[in-house]
């Protein structure tokens, strides 16, 4: 059995989304180009693909998935701030 690779920032991003009030389901184990996260926030459903940094590219499977996906766009996030922005909110700086 092979396991899906989880980006190092995955847990941090999931925790921040949940703290912001989102429901988060990790889809990382699905493979076949499926985005990493299913996110529900304020009656909206989002898909998020986590990347380790700004330079990381989509895999061919991810590109194929997004090309066939009939729902909303997949958000590419590489940081907590990017994930929070994808929700349409700005994180408060303390």
For the regions a language model picked out, list residue spans one by one.
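Catalytic phosphate/metal-binding cores of nucleic-acid and nucleotide-processing enzymes, i.e., regions
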Residues: 1-94
